[in-house]
Structure formats: structure tokens, C-alpha cells
Amino acid sequence: DSYQLKQTDAFVYLGGTISRDGSESDVKRRIGLARGLFQSLNNIWIAKELSRETKVQVYETLVLGVLLYNSETWTLKVEQKNRLRVLEMTFLRKIEGVTRRDRIRNVDIYARLNYHRNINDRIRERRLRYFGHICRMGRERYPTIVLNGHVHGRRNRGRPKKRWLDVVKEDCEEMGINIHEATRGAMDRERWTTMLTEHPMRAQASPRL
């Protein structure tokens, strides 16, 4: 029997949102899920008997685990990066027990909590690790085919959408290497891990946010 497939603008597959707007819907959904989880753990954030270290560990394990799920596939716009950074600072200020009215700079919040990498650096590292994983796959694997494939036909008018590989190239530039060096380095898992460690991301947040 024939089965008619329903057309939709977005659907959830393996926990990630696949949509026409790229990463936008998935980012919004993840922000909503993470915010709800963070609020449900309020008793932990306000607990006087728990150390900063313990609270940060809970935050990184639970909240970031939800927020950053599937983030290695995201192609983020500047607006989305800013939204994620503001959300992160809202969370961290709550953990530290301060608000924006206290006029404490972001870098000082990071220092107090011994928190070394901002959320966009974490996403960048996850994306590069996933890029390395794809590079080590065989050419016949679907992720490799999609990464290296080209879509034939006319492009729509206007500025073309940024591809995932374009973002990876920008990530590599942040590390001070080019995409060709990254591709060669990624073929060796241990070497790629070392490269990511030796070329740390720019982890300082803007003190104005």
C-alpha cells in the first residue's frame, strides 16, 4: 500500500529539530528546555551548604548537557551566539548569587566560579571534534558524502546561506590554522585532540554583557 508522507516545516529526530530555517528552531527549543531545567533546579543554586564547584558541576552536567545537545551541527548567526551568551551569563549569575544590578563584569563571574570556557567556545570545540570524526570516516559514509557533496541547480537570489563547513573554516581560523591543516590533523584522532588543546579558543566573554 502506498503511504502519503506529510510535509512539515520542522520535525524532531533523535532529539534534534530538523527544520527549513537551519539551526534556528533547534536553538530555540534547546534554550527553552535548558531554561526550564535550570529553573527546576533552583533549590540547588540557592543552597548555602553547596560549594560553587558543586553547583558548577551540576550546571555543566545537567543544564549544559541539555542546552548543547546536537550543537555540533549548528550553524549559528551572531544574534544566536549573543542569545546563548546572555542566557549563559544569566545562569552563571544565578549560581553566583548576583544579578546584573550588582554590576559585576562577566570576566569576574567567570573567575569567581573558576569557569574557563564560554558557551560559544564549547560549541566550537564540539563542532571541531565532530568535524574530526567525519574526516576519519570512510568516503562511502553518508556524513562524508554530505560534507563533500555539491547540490546542482540554481541558487536563490541574495546572499547564500552559510554552510556548516564554512563555519568549521571560521573555527579553524580562530585556532590559527587553515582547513587543509585541520583536515590532515583530524585524520589522527590523538593528534587532532592535541591540536584542539594546543590552540585554545578565545574564551573571554565581553565584560559589557
Language-model segment annotations:
Residues 1-209:
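Short linear motifs embedded in intrinsically disordered, charge-biased segments
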